[in-house]
């Protein structure tokens, strides 16, 4: 939650007119609980989605995440049914996926070609086998934390923003 990639993703979505919620998964920061290999963290994400929808039921949901959070967003997307799914360097090899039914939603994957934490070939192979409808943006010369390339991540979000979500208006709460 407190890294520059997550902040850039949140700012990019805010610039498009959306409200954003960032949170820690169980066992991270001051959160209670322990790491659960993506299963419990999916429940955490769905609890946040339920809270957001209770506050702003008429606003389209955009679900996103970075690294482990990206993989959890994929796991949560089928139940959450977002209008758009954005995963940045999703750590698909670090969460359980054998029980996963992928969502049929508009989906953007942004991946650094030189990522040494979540290798691009791992993500591309996983996506190609399971999610051919996803739009993949592979950024040359970019590592896991997008050092010196955050502007490219922001541009990807802006350029790929679905027209159906234009002019989001989030009512004041």
Model features per residue range: what roles?
Residues 128-145:
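Catalytic histidine neighborhood in serine/cysteine hydrolases
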Residues 113-118, 144-145:
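Acidic catalytic loop of the alpha/beta-hydrolase fold
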Residues 119-128:
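Short alpha-helix in the alpha/beta-hydrolase fold that links the catalytic acid
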Residues 65-73:
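Gly/Ala-rich beta-loop-alpha elbow adjacent to hydrolase catalytic centers
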Residues 147-161:
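Post-His helix in hydrolase/transferase enzymes
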Residues 1-24:
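Short, surface-exposed "cap/lid" segments of acyl-processing enzymes
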Residues 5, 35-55:
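Alpha/beta-hydrolase active-site loop
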Residues 103-104, 108-111, 115:
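Short beta-strand/loop motif that positions the catalytic acidic residue
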């Amino acid at each position: 939650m407190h890294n520059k990639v997550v902040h850039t993703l949140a700012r990019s979505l805010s610039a498009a007119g959306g409200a954003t919620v960032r949170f820690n998964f169980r066992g991270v920061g001051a959160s209670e609980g322990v790491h659960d290999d993506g299963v419990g963290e999916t429940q955490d994400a769905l609890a946040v989605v339920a809270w957001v929808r209770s506050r702003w039921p008429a606003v389209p949901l955009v679900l996103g995440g970075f690294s482990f959070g990206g993989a959890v967003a994929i796991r949560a997307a089928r139940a959450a049914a977002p209008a758009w799914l954005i995963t940045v360097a999703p750590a698909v090899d670090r969460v359980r996926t054998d029980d996963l039914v992928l969502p049929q939603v508009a989906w953007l994957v942004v991946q650094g070609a030189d990522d040494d934490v979540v290798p691009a070939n791992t993500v591309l192979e996983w996506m190609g086998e399971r999610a051919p409808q996803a739009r993949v943006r592979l950024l040359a010369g970019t590592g896991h934390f997008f050092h010196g390339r955050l502007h490219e991540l922001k541009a990807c979000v802006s350029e790929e923003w679905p027209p159906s979500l234009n002019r989001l208006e989030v009512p004041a709460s």
